[in-house]
């Protein structure tokens, strides 16, 4: 067995490796240079090499079990595949410039090492079921890495929430002050969004865990191969039940792209808030120097580029999903060469998230919350108005009338430049007959931020005891998600 070549596309002696194709018997000439260039995908799919080798080992074993390889041939093939796997991992084997795709490069390497025996491995399989298998294997591994990164970000948000458990903040709708909440409650809302992302990826894995290998080009194989054995060895739950669907299905790729795009949307929303929070107008957080940048002309600037780039890359992730769905929408069964384009958007979405998530995690973990500024903003904008209305409801006033009465109270305060808590009893009585002495006493109990927050004690609300419950549930869920991410598929 020869040593792997040290130079890309060259034999050990230095001469160029001839073009190797997995097809061509019926052709009298090779493809035009422009066609070869158009067809080539090796620069994109080479990252699948070790997964292709892993699938090849499983395929070699079922060939042997079917009597199509003897014990010595199987041993030689497995040894060559192991050696090639090490060479790919170390980078000592690289594809040649003329290799069309990952399958071509690896078969060429086997033929160079084993001669005709290397060609026996292709029996009973096609590039169609190979690539579908490789891509599923690759994504199932890397989705767990994504989930781990999402868990890290959620922990950063949880840590900030725990450091500011008692900090009141203005809850907003339409970016206007609405009702006071705990800042921890707000951060946990982002945790909830990312938790759904984790759940989506975990649910995606259940559907992606179907093995296409054995489907051949589209119709299955006439050879007595055992697809259940291949599926089990590769960590799949079952082989594909329909060989045509096995090679044509890219739902798993589209679902991945959707889940990735939604992560991007959630990162963008978090990023947008951080951009606002660190502005002079809000002044709620100070970014760590390691997670901010400056200006080439304005010396005073400290820019939230990490948050802005996360926001910007959401469009890229959405575009990848659109690209993939548009490519898939008109394809007749079974395999079409259009499917070669599935890897560009999928890999880009994966790479983008693996780039953004650690940076956003560091940004969140290191940002300093200016608690005084946040707390001071909590009661602004008549944010206790709903609490006043609900205090009247507890006293038996229909909500419609309570809403009208408090609306008049807010209008009076706005006209007189004062706040709700500053209105005296006589003024309340003049504003609405519903502000009776008994009702006024109830209203006074909620005219504080702490009182209003404490009153929101329904399940899922912002009262301190409810937020503590949310934190406990989140910690348990994160531990479970981390365990799933760290386990092999």
Swiss-Prot record:
Residues 1-20 are annotated as: Disordered. CDD domains: Argininosuccinate_lyase (cd01359). Pfam families: ASL_C2 (PF14698), Lyase_1 (PF00206). InterPro entries: Arg_succ_lyase_C (IPR029419), Argininosuccinate_lyase (IPR009049), Fumarase/histidase_N (IPR024083), Fumarate_lyase_CS (IPR020557), Fumarate_lyase_fam (IPR000362), Fumarate_lyase_N (IPR022761), L-Aspartase-like (IPR008948). Pathway: Amino-acid biosynthesis; L-arginine biosynthesis; L-arginine from L-ornithine and carbamoyl phosphate: step 3/3. Coiled coil: none annotated. One of its GO terms (cellular component) is cytosol. Its EC number is 4.3.2.1. Transmembrane segments: none annotated. It is an enzyme of class 4 (lyase). It is found in: Cytoplasm. Its main location: cytoplasm. GO terms for biological process: arginine biosynthetic process via ornithine; L-arginine biosynthetic process. Keywords: Amino-acid biosynthesis, Arginine biosynthesis, Cytoplasm, Lyase. It catalyses: 2-(N(omega)-L-arginino)succinate = fumarate + L-arginine. GO terms for molecular function: argininosuccinate lyase activity. Belongs to the lyase 1 family. Argininosuccinate lyase subfamily. This is Argininosuccinate lyase. The lineage of its organism: Bacteria, Bacillati, Actinomycetota, Actinomycetes, Acidothermales. The gene is argH.
């Amino acid at each position: 067995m020869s040593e792997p070549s040290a130079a890309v596309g060259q034999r050990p002696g230095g001469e160029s490796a001839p073009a190797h194709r997995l097809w061509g018997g019926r052709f009298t000439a090779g493809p035009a240079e422009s066609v070869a260039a158009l067809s080539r995908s090796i620069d994109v799919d080479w990252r699948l090499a070790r997964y292709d080798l892993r699938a090849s080992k499983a395929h070699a074993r079922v060939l042997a079990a079917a009597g199509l390889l003897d014990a010595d041939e199987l041993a030689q093939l497995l040894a060559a595949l192991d050696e090639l796997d090490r060479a790919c991992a170390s980078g000592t084997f690289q594809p040649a410039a003329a290799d069309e795709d990952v399958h071509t490069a690896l078969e060429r390497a086997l033929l160079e090492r084993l001669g005709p025996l290397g060609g026996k491995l292709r029996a009973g399989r096609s590039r169609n079921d190979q690539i579908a298998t490789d891509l599923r294997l690759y994504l199932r591994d890397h989705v767990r890495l994504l989930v781990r990164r999402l868990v890290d970000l959620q922990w950063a948000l949880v840590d900030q929430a725990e450091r500011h458990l008692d900090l009141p903040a203005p809850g907003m709708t339409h970016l206007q002050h609405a009702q006071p909440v705990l800042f921890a409650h707000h951060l946990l809302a982002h945790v909830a969004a990312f938790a759904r992302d984790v759940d989506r990826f975990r649910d995606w894995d259940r559907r992606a865990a179907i093995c296409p290998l054995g489907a051949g080009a589209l119709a299955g194989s006439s050879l007595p191969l055992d697809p259940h054995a291949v599926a089990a060895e590769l960590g799949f739950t079952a082989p594909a039940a329909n060989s045509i669907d096995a090679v044509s299905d890219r739902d798993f790729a589209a679902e991945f792209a959707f889940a990735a795009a939604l992560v991007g949307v959630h990162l963008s929303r978090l990023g947008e808030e951080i951009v606002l929070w660190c502005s002079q107008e809000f002044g709620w957080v100070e970014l760590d120097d390691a997670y901010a940048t400056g200006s080439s002309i304005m010396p005073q600037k400290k820019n939230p580029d990490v948050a802005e780039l996360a926001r910007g890359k959401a469009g890229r992730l959405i575009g990848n999903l659109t690209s993939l769905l548009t490519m898939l929408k008109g394809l007749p069964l079974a395999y079409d060469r259009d499917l070669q384009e599935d890897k560009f958007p999928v890999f880009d979405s994966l790479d983008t998230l693996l780039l953004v998530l650690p940076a956003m995690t560091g940004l969140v973990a290191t940002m300093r919350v200016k608690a005084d500024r946040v707390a001071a903003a909590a009661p602004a904008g008549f944010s206790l108005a709903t609490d006043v209305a609900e205090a009247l409801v507890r006293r038996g006033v229909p909500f419609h009338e309570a809403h009208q009465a408090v609306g008049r109270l807010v209008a009076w305060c706005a006209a007189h430049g004062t706040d709700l808590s500053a209105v005296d009893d006589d003024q309340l009585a003049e504003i609405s007959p519903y502000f009776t002495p008994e009702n006024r006493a109830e209203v006074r109990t909620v005219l504080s931020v702490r009182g209003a927050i404490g009153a929101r004690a329904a399940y899922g609300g912002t009262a301190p005891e409810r937020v503590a419950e949310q934190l406990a549930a989140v910690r348990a869920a994160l531990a479970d998600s981390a365990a799933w991410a760290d386990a092999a598929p």
